[in-house]
Amino acid sequence: MEGHLSDGLVEVGPNGRERYYDSSGYGRPDGAGVRLAPVEAAYLLARGDLDAVDGMGLEAFLADTPDLVVPFLVYRDLRERGFYVSPALEGWVADHAGIDFVVHPRGDGPWDGTVAYRVRVVDERGSVRLDSLGDVVLAVVDEESELTYLETDRPAVDGTSGLEADLTADGVLLEDRVLCWDAPPALYEQGFYGQRMDREDGPLQLSLLEAAHLAATGVLSVAGGAAAVEARGRDAEGERFDRRLTVYRTLRERGVVPKTGFKFGADFRTYADVDSVSELGHSELLVRVLPADATLSPRDVALDVRLAHGVRKRMVFALVDDGDEIRWVSVSRLTP
């Protein structure tokens, strides 16, 4: 059978519906015929299930539509994994904006209206606006045409950690940290604030983020109060400090303990359920704090995810806008 290009779709005449849509979920019915998206037509040409499109075989068809190559690679891979795949065209799928394909659960087709994955195709050299993620799968195609799937979500970040007793401590601001000489033991043991300087009962050193939060909540007394600590933080980091402080405070308010994630290349590693430092488990998340409009390359996203996976943690981006609202986006590897 041969197709004909019309209004950006490939029309296949009589018997097209039965052969392509009814039996295998390709395209959308058009009477007894079927209308195929170009990527579907390319796949059928590659399989030999479609003879030509306006006389063109696969080579000529791809040459005529060069921007089709990368989506074709993803479509082919998903089809060969056993999925029915609908191109995300208006009128074909619901909520089509921002995606390229809807992947139906195995055993289902476009007539079922079910969704396993909403897929966006990204070239390795492209860019990803992080606040557009959260309900899509990124299908990243590298320069050797290998595929990496990254699943994104908007997680609920919360825990049960906190201080049960009202505590107070005095501190001294020294360069980029605060030192507490006689801090209550529970501040560290139960709240996991700071680090002991030299031994179990030694002075407690707090990061500027920890000190700013404790000063703002009335736990820590320091010359100049929270404002002095925050000013020192801005001197050291600029606006980045304010974003990180917003995320730090929010995590603490939600019962999550944030600690430095420096050795993992992140802003924080987090613990959701801290009862005591002596019984501390592994951290669950790596958190990078970025502006709300942050854009990263697929390579950078993949590196973050790979590192988090390698240390058995989940990668989360905390996107902070000018009003201190936070959008949480998690990204992880996916094998469809």
UniProtKB/Swiss-Prot annotation:
InterPro entries: tRNA_endonuc-like_dom_sf, tRNA_intron_Endo_cat-like_sf, tRNA_intron_Endonuc_cat-like, tRNA_intron_Endonuc_N, tRNA_intron_Endonuc_N_sf, tRNA_splic, tRNA_splic_arch_long. Pfam families: tRNA_int_endo (PF01974), tRNA_int_endo_N (PF02778). The gene is endA. CDD domains: tRNA-intron_lyase_C (cd22363). Keywords: Lyase, tRNA processing. The lineage of its organism: Archaea, Methanobacteriati, Methanobacteriota, Stenosarchaea group, Halobacteria. This is tRNA-splicing endonuclease. GO terms for biological process: tRNA-type intron splice site recognition and cleavage. It comes from Natronomonas pharaonis (strain ATCC 35678 / DSM 2160 / CIP 103997 / JCM 8858 / NBRC 14720 / NCIMB 2260 / Gabara) (Halobacterium pharaonis). GO terms for molecular function: lyase activity; nucleic acid binding; tRNA-intron endonuclease activity. Gene3D superfamilies: 3.40.1350.10, tRNA intron endonuclease, N-terminal domain (3.40.1170.20). Its EC number is 4.6.1.16. Belongs to the tRNA-intron endonuclease family. Archaeal long subfamily. The keyword Protein biosynthesis does not apply. Homodimer. It catalyses: pretRNA = a 3'-half-tRNA molecule with a 5'-OH end + a 5'-half-tRNA molecule with a 2',3'-cyclic phosphate end + an intron with a 2',3'-cyclic phosphate and a 5'-hydroxyl terminus. Endonuclease that removes tRNA introns. Cleaves pre-tRNA at the 5'- and 3'-splice sites to release the intron. The products are an intron and two tRNA half-molecules bearing 2',3' cyclic phosphate and 5'-OH termini. Recognizes a pseudosymmetric substrate in which 2 bulged loops of 3 bases are separated by a stem of 4 bp. The active site is at Y271, H282, K313.
